[in-house]
Structures are given as C-alpha cells and as structure tokens.
Amino acid sequence: MIKIDVFIKDKNWKKHISNPAKYLKDKVKFINSSTLFNKKYINFSILLAGNKEIKMLNNKFRKKNKTTNILSFPFYKRNEIKKKIKNEDRIYLGDIILNFYKIKKKARKNEFEKEFNKLWIHGLLHLLGYQHDTNKDFYKMRKLENRIFKQTEKTEC
C-alpha cells in the first residue's frame, strides 16, 4: 500500500488540477501491483509549492539561491533504501517539492498534467535511490520513469 501526503502551498495548483491530493492518490494506485515495493507499506509526501517556497528550500538545503522545478529529500541514503525496502514492512521514503511555475512554463498548451506526472515520478525515483549521475544511471532511471509514466497515463482521475 502506498500512502501519499499532499500539501498545497501555492493556490495556482488548483487552477490546473482541481483536487491535487485525490489526483495523486489515484495515480499512485497502480504502483501497488508493481515489483518496486513488494507489497510493503510505503509513505512519502509531496509539497505543491511556488517559486518563493522552493527557492527558500533550495537555498536552505542545497545552498543554491535560485528556483528549481523539483526538490527531492530522501529519508534514507542511496545505499540504504534497497535494503530497507527488502527488510522493512513500513517505509517512509521522504519528501518531494514541486514548483508550479516551472512546470507551467515547461508544459505546452493543455499538457500541464503530463509534465506534472513526469516530474513527481522523477522525484519518487530519487526517493527510491535512483540517480542520473552517469549515462548508465540516467538511462536506467529514464527507462523506469517512462514505464511508470505510461501506466499513470492509462488511469483516469
């Protein structure tokens, strides 16, 4: 089972997705049947923010005084997460912060949800220890992102 906690800091999110919490909870349902979690109780949170909030967090935790599209804060170190998923029944993965304005800017007309889905999936994979530091890691992560994205696109929210 996957539990996702959604917090909305910027009101503009609801202009594009009327109920973001329900939307995300509906989207993650399919992951229960995947082999990523092997029937574990998984929890993570998403903060739907704007430029101001994400810039402040980026500066505070990464010492980068600029806005960004996404921040991921894994609860476990990269080399610990796979062991935790294998051995623990309940796991808190961490936090994802998404920037409405960066997503809106990158999304083409009527493709806000598509861009939003790509980004939260990307963040979730970071919480699971996936990185894109090398070409090999990049392609491995991208392949999994695309597979999950295709599954979420089939769901109706």
Describe each region flagged by the PLM.
Residues 1-117, 127-157:
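An acidic/histidine-cluster motif and surrounding catalytic segment
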